[in-house]
């Protein structure tokens, strides 16, 4: 019995020792990882170091023209036109990127800036933080996959990976938040009512004599793609320019079913643009779209 108890005590001691070694190694590994991270951070060259949340203004030109965005009350806007339907994820990604740029190399004793193409920068990105501090990044020539970069007012030249440009490499059209458009076809179109010059024409799916007409207008409604805009935030006083004022426009009201419930889509059709399109608006939207004459003719059954 004593031998048995002694064996159990030995096994218990070994187990305790193994547990102690395990936790000791785990602690040591964690310390080593933390140390490695600290060393890596210490070796990292920060070109910019500003929290994205603190950035309130972005101004840049990376080959798509001058663009500027501002943030007010945590909301981003296109600075020249606050009514522009901006997808906020774009400036948010830009701020996240530009506020935390690291360099591959820091060239402290290099050539003059013209040797790096920084006397006439290819691109510029400027941001301002909530305290009014401004930083302007100048992008010169490329070296491999990197750009030569410097901060305006600072003589230090860095190499920065070209991916820094990616979040900025969009046109204003790319960053527009366009309206949603429903899926409409002959299978779910219930009725279409067209009002023009005070006269109303109705196409009803329950009228068997209008089966061909319903198929035609449903084909037109189903072919609409809200992908090209002529004006992103039209003012009421400018609607007549597009033939979309109340006295000039054609009103199309389409009743359709979605998830077994009836929905109403209201379209306004205006003038032709001279290039094979017509100006079109959705009810309650400020965006003027371009839709082909052919599609509009099908919607109007002409």
Q: What are the functions of these language-model segments?
A:
Residues 1-302:
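Secondary-structure "cap/kink" motif recognition
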